[in-house]
């Protein structure tokens, strides 16, 4: 089947992600949640694809299955529970461990199992699995934004699937005999250039769509463990289990040296910090926006800001949806001045760098059939 999404020479992984997200949105190929940007798309036909996974011999023969918690893999989780397999899901953002095991209550009905397979069920019916439990995983099922028939995979950009697999390899939970499957829409299968693939990226053995079962025969190795030299110490603070794994590997005599910030990069970072020091009121406005308040009461910003002007906003888009989108894209402004009736809005940022980054990201978004127009306006004193 000829790929419907083409990757041009010189395009980055983020270019590919935006192409896929925009294509799925404009073609209306996804179910809730929408928009699909910054998500593993819950594509139409996901249940049919999951049913194909359940029919695979490697699924039937697996005793322990690790499945991502994203919505399109819900059918695989349900199939695993119905087949009485040991079902593992990643701990959210790896904050408190690596795995949770879904444990349905005794005498669970089909409806209870269905609930257990959902995001709500994962919260209510799961227990953490510790590093000492020595889990052996037979099959890994991951979501993807884009994949190739060669087994190359591009996720949503946070790196958790890659990190989870590397951590499992570090723990001895996966081996060369562990299969990796991804469940996607046909449009997500494309020719991914090899130069976009890095050594920490997770490869897939099977691609399952609603219409196809593709065995990739991937030649690239999967991660064999954590590449400590690619991690900063800040990442260990965010993911505590990494500290434990690093200690274990260090005790085993392995090289666990972390990535060092280059002197030039450090000087550049310091110079940027000197150019703009965070204002207490800016931090307060940021928190107010994050808690769904349009603006903080009692004051207007009294420091230099740069405005991003949005036009051609979809008529049905609500300000709450825009806020959610800005959070997902990690371009939260100090303040939003909403003029939905006129299909425009003004986003206030603390400095030109933040505004410029937001403009570049927002210009690529395709929401509800519309491309939002974003333009950076010169700094002003508010």
From Swiss-Prot:
Could you tell me which residue ranges the RRM domain spans?
306-382
Which SUPFAM superfamilies does the record match to this protein?
Answer: NagB/RpiA/CoA transferase-like (SSF100950), RNA-binding domain, RBD (SSF54928)
User: Which Gene3D superfamilies would you find in this protein's record?
Assistant: 3.30.70.330, NagB/RpiA/CoA transferase-like (3.40.50.10420)
Q: Which InterPro entries match?
A: FTHF_cligase (IPR002698), FTHF_cligase-like_sf (IPR024185), MTHFSD_RRM (IPR034359), NagB/RpiA_transferase-like (IPR037171), Nucleotide-bd_a/b_plait_sf (IPR012677), RBD_domain_sf (IPR035979)
Q: Which domain of life is it from?
A: Eukaryota
Could you tell me one molecular function GO term of this UniProt entry?
Answer: RNA binding
Q: Name one GO cellular component term.
A: cytoplasm
Protein name (database record):
Methenyltetrahydrofolate synthase domain-containing protein
Q: Which organism is it from?
A: Danio rerio (Zebrafish)
UniProt gene name: mthfsd
């Amino acid at each position: 089947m000829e790929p419907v999404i083409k990757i041009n020479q010189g395009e980055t992984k983020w270019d590919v992600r935006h192409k896929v997200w925009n294509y799925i949105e404009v073609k209306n190929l996804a179910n809730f949640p929408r928009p699909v940007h910054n998500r593993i798309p819950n594509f139409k036909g996901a249940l049919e694809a999951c049913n194909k996974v359940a029919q695979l011999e490697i699924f039937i023969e697996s005793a322990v299955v690790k499945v991502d918690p994203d919505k399109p893999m819900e059918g695989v989780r349900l199939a695993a529970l119905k087949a009485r397999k040991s079902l593992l899901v990643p701990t959210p953002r790896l904050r408190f461990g690596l795995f949770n095991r879904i444990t349905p209550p005794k005498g669970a009905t089909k409806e209870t199992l269905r609930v257990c397979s959902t995001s709500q069920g994962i919260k209510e019916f799961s227990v953490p699995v510790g590093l000492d439990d020595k889990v052996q995983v037979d099959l890994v099922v991951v979501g993807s934004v884009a994949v190739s028939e060669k087994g190359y995979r591009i996720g949503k950009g946070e790196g958790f699937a890659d990190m989870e697999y590397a951590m499992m390899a570090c723990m001895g939970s996966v081996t060369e005999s562990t299969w990796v499957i991804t469940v996607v829409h046909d449009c997500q299968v494309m020719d991914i250039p090899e130069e976009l693939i890095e050594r920490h990226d997770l490869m897939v053995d099977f691609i399952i769509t609603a219409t196809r079962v593709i065995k990739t025969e991937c030649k690239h190795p999967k991660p064999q463990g954590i590449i400590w030299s690619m991690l900063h110490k800040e990442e260990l603070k965010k993911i505590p289990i990494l500290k434990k794994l690093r200690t274990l590997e260090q005790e085993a005599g392995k090289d666990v040296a972390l990535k060092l910030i280059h002197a030039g990069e450090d000087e550049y970072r310091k110079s940027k910090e000197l150019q703009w020091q965070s204002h207490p009121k800016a931090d307060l406005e940021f928190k107010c926006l994050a808690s769904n308040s349009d603006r903080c009461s009692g004051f207007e910003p009294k420091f230099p800001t740069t405005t991003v002007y949005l036009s051609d906003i979809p008529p049905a888009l609500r300000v709450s949806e825009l806020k959610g989108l800005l959070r997902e894209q990690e371009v939260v402004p100090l303040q939003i001045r909403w003029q939905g009736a006129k299909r425009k809005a003004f986003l206030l940022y603390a400095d030109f760098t933040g505004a410029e980054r937001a403009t570049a990201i927002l210009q690529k978004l395709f929401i509800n059939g519309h491309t939002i127009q974003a333009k950076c306006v010169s700094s002003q004193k508010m």
